[in-house]
């Protein structure tokens, strides 16, 4: 009898877990219905550029003194970064000469990097400013696309590609750090009243920003594209997407999973 009860309990738990997994993860007011793509964010430099050694040293120091963790909790609700820590790293590389560091960022990568009003903001942007402050440098941000990062570095338009960028690591002419953060591009609905599965999106309207990376992620799922009623490309960034979802103007949106911790 005890074995039968135990077996029944295990089956019940298994069924419950399968049911929950099919309904997506709920984060605050929102539900993650599907993960379309996983990205790894890295920082790119020109080969043998001394900028890397100073930036790396500053990052190790900021990781050791808790600055990076504080920023991560502010933007993500947790510290999910993987920077090396060394409180003495800046002392080991010596004093850096004053300069302006040109930082190439994806301006549509909330909450990593984005434009708010007339200025840049986001986790990567604030961290780059902290790095420059610790080095006695000034940060200047320039909008780029991940696919153009190496061209921008080679031309001298930027000194570092850093800000919501998933960089290819194949070109030996450039130096790319180990990934410091992993992110997913996901489909999100309202937790209350929204679709719980991809099947529930049949005939629905899905919105994304005008950045091509989101359409590329969606295009990998042909069955989903055929199931949707309408796909909208909207301007105004991530905030606009959540506004449209909250108002009922659209049924689902494509965003970074990291954004849910901020908006959820």
What is the predicted function of each stretch?
Residues 59-95, 213-236:
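Ligand-binding clefts/hinges and TM-proximal coupling segments of bilobed small-molecule sensing domains
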Residues 102-110, 117-133, 165-166, 183-239, ...:
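Bilobed "Venus flytrap"/periplasmic-binding protein-like clamshell domains
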Residues 137-138, 154-163, 204-206, 245-259:
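Alpha-to-beta junction loops
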Residues 1-9:
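Bacterial N-terminal signal peptides that target proteins for export
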Residues 24, 35-81, 125-134, 192-195, ...:
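Extended ligand-binding regions for polar small-molecule ligands
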Residues 19-22:
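C-terminal motif of bacterial Sec signal peptides marking the signal peptidase cleavage site
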Residues 45-53, 62-63, 118-126, 143-147, ...:
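Soluble non-cytosolic domains of exported or imported proteins
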Residues 26-38, 45, 94, 125, ...:
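Acidic, polar ligand-binding/catalytic clefts
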């Amino acid at each position: 009898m005890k074995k039968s009860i135990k077996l029944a309990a295990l089956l019940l738990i298994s069924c419950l877990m399968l049911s929950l997994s099919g309904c997506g993860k709920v984060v605050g007011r929102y539900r993650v219905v599907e993960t379309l793509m996983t990205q790894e964010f890295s920082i790119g430099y020109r080969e043998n550029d001394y900028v890397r050694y100073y930036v790396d040293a500053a990052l190790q120091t900021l990781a050791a003194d808790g600055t990076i963790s504080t920023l991560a909790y502010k933007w993500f609700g947790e510290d999910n970064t993987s920077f090396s820590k060394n409180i003495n790293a800046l002392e080991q590389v010596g004093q850096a000469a004053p300069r302006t560091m040109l930082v190439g960022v994806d301006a549509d990568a909330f909450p990593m990097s984005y434009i708010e009003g007339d200025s840049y903001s986001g986790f990567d942007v604030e961290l780059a400013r902290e790095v420059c402050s610790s080095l006695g440098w000034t940060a200047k941000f320039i909008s780029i696309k991940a696919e153009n990062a190496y061209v921008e570095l080679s031309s001298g338009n930027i000194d570092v590609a850093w800000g919501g960028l998933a960089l290819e690591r194949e070109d030996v002419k450039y130096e790319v750090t180990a990934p410091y953060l992993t992110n997913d591009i996901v489909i999100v609905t309202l937790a209350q009243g929204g679709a719980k599965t991809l099947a529930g999106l049949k005939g629905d309207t899905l919105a994304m920003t005008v950045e091509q990376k989101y359409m590329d992620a969606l295009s990998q799922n042909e069955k989903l594209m055929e199931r949707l009623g309408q796909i909208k490309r909207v301007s105004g960034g991530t905030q606009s997407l959540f506004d449209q979802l909250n108002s009922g103007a659209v049924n689902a949106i494509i965003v970074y999973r990291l954004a849910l911790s901020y908006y959820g």
